[in-house]
């Protein structure tokens, strides 16, 4: 959420510690790595030590606790610093993509990722949609594969993903919840109470649309034509 604000505050300023990713698909990218934000010198010093394999201040390699090799290379850091002045420009490009989707998909039984404009200003990093329940065609997902049964006037994330892939455009489901991952399925977790599993429902009906800031209006219109055709 780099660049996004909530009630006038940058999202990275909430809490004692915040983390920012510079992965290859982020709004500012170094292809990998990230940053930790804190006003605590104690926390910052601790993390710096851990990131250099927890090496002690000695002439030899001295390790008294477990550390990690999480240092960012100078090359990656330079790439990130070189992009930072363009953050506002990237956000404007992302917002234009979001607004074109919202206008171009108007009339379909979908909802674009919402935000509370009176309180929040997103960075519009990723444009997503949620298909109305009544407009979902049958869809089944295993751990690695998915299938669907097409129905007139209805669609599902799997159908749209496959249709866009034929145009060489990548779309993906919204993130699979941690408690549904095979590694965690047999682990205990705390829920908000009985009722609908909101995360699982969003994963089932949600879709991340192509959102690269270099996406042209013409190509985006073709993507929207494909999405509209899935609901025909």
Model-inferred region functions:
Residues 1-21:
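Conserved PLP phosphate-binding loop immediately N-terminal to the Schiff-base lysine helix
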Residues 2, 29, 215:
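Hydrophobic/aromatic residue at the end of a short beta strand that borders the catalytic acidic motif
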């Amino acid at each position: 959420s780099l660049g996004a604000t909530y009630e006038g505050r940058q999202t990275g300023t909430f809490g004692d510690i915040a983390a920012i990713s510079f992965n290859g698909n982020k709004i500012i990218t170094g292809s990998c790595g990230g940053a930790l934000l804190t006003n605590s010198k104690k926390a910052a010093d601790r993390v710096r030590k851990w990131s250099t394999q927890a090496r002690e201040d000695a002439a030899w390699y001295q390790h008294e606790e477990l550390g990690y090799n999480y240092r960012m290379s100078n090359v990656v850091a330079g790439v990130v610093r070189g992009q930072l002045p363009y953050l506002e420009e990237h956000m404007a490009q992302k917002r234009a993509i979001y607004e074109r989707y919202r206008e171009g998909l108007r009339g379909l039984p979908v909802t674009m990722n919402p935000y509370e404009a009176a309180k929040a200003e997103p960075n519009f990093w990723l444009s997503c949609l949620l298909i109305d329940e009544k407009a979902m065609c049958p869809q089944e997902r295993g751990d690695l594969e998915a299938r669907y049964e097409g129905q007139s006037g209805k669609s599902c994330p799997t159908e749209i993903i496959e249709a866009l892939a034929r145009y060489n455009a990548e779309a993906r489901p919204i993130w699979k919840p941690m408690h549904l991952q095979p590694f965690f399925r047999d682990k205990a977790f705390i829920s908000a109470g009985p009722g609908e599993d909101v995360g699982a429902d969003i994963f089932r009906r949600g879709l991340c649309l192509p959102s690269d800031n270099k996406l042209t209006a013409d190509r985006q219109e073709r993507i929207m034509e494909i999405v509209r055709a899935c609901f025909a």
